[in-house]
Amino acid sequence: MSLAADNVLLVEEGRPATAEHPSAGPVYRCKYAKDGLLDLPTDIDSPWQFFSEAVKKYPNEQMLGQRVTTDSKVGPYTWITYKEAHDAAIRIGSAIRSRGVDPGHCCGIYGANCPEWIIAMEACMSQGITYVPLYDSLGVNAVEFIINHAEVSLVFVQEKTVSSILSCQKGCSSNLKTIVSFGEVSSTQKEEAKNQCVSLFSWNEFSLMGNLDEANLPRKRKTDICTIMYTSGTTGEPKGVILNNAAISVQVLSIDKMLEVTDRSCDTSDVFFSYLPLAHCYDQVMEIYFLSRGSSVGYWRGDIRYLMDDVQALKPTVFCGVPRVYDKLYAGIMQKISASGLIRKKLFDFAYNYKLGNMRKGFSQEEASPRLDRLMFDKIKEALGGRAHMLLSGAAPLPRHVEEFLRIIPASNLSQGYGLTESCGGSFTTLAGVFSMVGTVGVPMPTVEARLVSVPEMGYDAFSADVPRGEICLRGNSMFSGYHKRQDLTDQVLIDGWFHTGDIGEWQEDGSMKIIDRKKNIFKLSQGEYVAVENLENTYSRCPLIAQIWVYGNSFESFLVGVVVPDRKAIEDWAKLNYQSPNDFESLCQNLKAQKYFLDELNSTAKQYQLKGFEMLKAIHLEPNPFDIERDLITPTFKLKRPQLLQHYKGIVDQLYSEAKRSMA
């Protein structure tokens, strides 16, 4: 299959298999890198320059905003300017140096998204200090591991996390010497810190220890380590991904380039809503980009219950989400439309299908149905504050029906991407005006080249004349330098200059990439059938009755079972219709008739999407508690942690197999 030359360019022919290596397909890059991969200009050496230049251009523009709660009442967004944030970063950076942290040393940042997080990051950048984000959800053991592994001597922490960091001080006392709270600290905490031989400061105290002298800021180099980002992963200890100044800086330029060609470059009129974890590469690089353009960044309160309330208060122009959030947005809007009456529902369906048809013919978002946008869809856009002109999605593939909906309804451009911490965030992105890319993650970003490598054991052939499939491999200017202190792990994934992602992709004729599988998320049933479990979960998730699902099988069993978190309203509606006593949610999940109903509906969905017989579920457990980070069942980007899920539900899984075998006997 030849790929569309108007979207991607062939860089290098493929290579056949050898005794040591499987075959590898051709190398491609996107059309916006036709003269070579995007690289840094000679006058840019670090991300700090983006911020310092923005301060000169936009000193009085609103930069960082948050809502303050007083007497249980939340207020409007309050802002600090670029100049105020810059001065704070210079003072904090100076104070860090006064504690003996020198350029090249590591400084930790541990807490939820807030202005202080970004100021601490910029403070480190100003001094050439490597900042190490600590996930609020990693847990004390992982935090202790990272502090010791990265040799962090100073850490910034959220006010409510001070006690947590003090509790692990005993295990990292040889490294950690200074703790700085984003807010206040109590006298009791000060005393506890003193007893553990660590200095503890409030944000204001620490700021006063620094000065505003910019004359002696150290020189930065492109090859200096900017950050070490520890990925939570789904197994084992966290891995420290090394990203240097050049990788992050060129990724910022890459984002600007792709926004320019798919929508528009951002400017001082733009407002970005920050709620995805700042410790994760995706949101962090996006914020660095917006702050390079003089835009504003507003932070959520950190409570999922009030997420949409914060969106309404901020009215962002760019919304960066993950499939889980967009799924809920889609379900909420569709529920309101269904409840609006038959006539309104039919009018909506007509308008939706008319615009969908025009966009499939090649009309742009703006051209497809301007009158229907004003009459039908502009009101729906209010769900995201009414001003969003760009929606971005990452972390996992969007379900096709949700992606189509988001491209049509909010009258905003939607770009879905794919990337990893190792690729400094996005490595592929869809082109907003190319509707054929729905269901894919788009073309390579202008900083990277991509190829597929065959995976014979899974039946994926990167040389297939029909549809090339294989493991996605990347190389380029925004890639990581390796794993901190783990050359063994680096050598496993960096082979001949190519980073092996572990994700299985499929080239499309328009030059876009479709994620179809995960190399590690495949297992064989006892009769020899291979099961691509992530694909199955994505299919079963199309069933409107469920909120989350984990499918399990192994090579000793001939069939699959699952743990399902049901949609609460769906199971309560079923109870009313079937004269079952509603009781409480937990009791309904234990109801045998409810379990049978949900299993039948899931397998009906499986048949609808033509799953094979061995891919059908034979038994399920209805779980009232969502899979969450607190129990270590999902990652901060909502990916299932399969070993931990099996450990948590081992007894239930064994019971499901026993009961299913008895019923089949």
UniProtKB/Swiss-Prot annotation:
Activation of long-chain fatty acids for both synthesis of cellular lipids, and degradation via beta-oxidation. Acts in the cutin pathway. Preferentially uses palmitate, palmitoleate, oleate and linoleate. Required for repression of lateral root formation through its role in cutin biosynthesis and subsequent aerial tissues permeability. It holds the Pfam family AMP-binding. GO terms for biological process: cutin biosynthetic process; defense response to fungus; fatty acid metabolic process; lateral root formation. CDD domains: LC-FACS_euk. Disruption phenotype: Dwarf phenotype with smaller, wrinkled leaves and overall reduced vigor. Higher water loss rate and susceptibility to drought stress. Defective in the cuticular membrane. Strong resistance to virulent Botrytis cinerea and enhanced susceptibility to avirulent Pseudomonas syringae. This is Long chain acyl-CoA synthetase 2. Pathway: Lipid metabolism; fatty acid metabolism. Belongs to the ATP-dependent AMP-binding enzyme family. Residues 496-520 are annotated as: Fatty acid-binding. PANTHER family: LONG CHAIN ACYL-COA SYNTHETASE 2 (PTHR43272:SF4), LONG-CHAIN-FATTY-ACID--COA LIGASE (PTHR43272). The lineage of its organism: Eukaryota, Viridiplantae, Streptophyta, Embryophyta, Tracheophyta. It comes from the Eukaryota. GO terms for molecular function: ATP binding; long-chain fatty acid-CoA ligase activity; very long-chain fatty acid-CoA ligase activity. PROSITE patterns: AMP_BINDING. It catalyses: a long-chain fatty acid + ATP + CoA = a long-chain fatty acyl-CoA + AMP + diphosphate. Expressed along the entire length of the stem, but expression was not entirely epidermal specific, with some expression found in internal cell layers as well. Was expressed in leave epidermal cells, flowers (sepals, petals, stamens, filaments and carpel), siliques and developing seeds. In roots, expression was detected in an internal cell layer, probably the endodermal layer. GO terms for cellular component: endoplasmic reticulum; plasmodesma. Its main location: endoplasmic reticulum. It is found in: Endoplasmic reticulum. Its cofactor is Mg(2+). Induction: Positively regulated by WIN1. ATP binds at residues 228-239. The keyword S-adenosyl-L-methionine does not apply. Its EC number is 6.2.1.3.
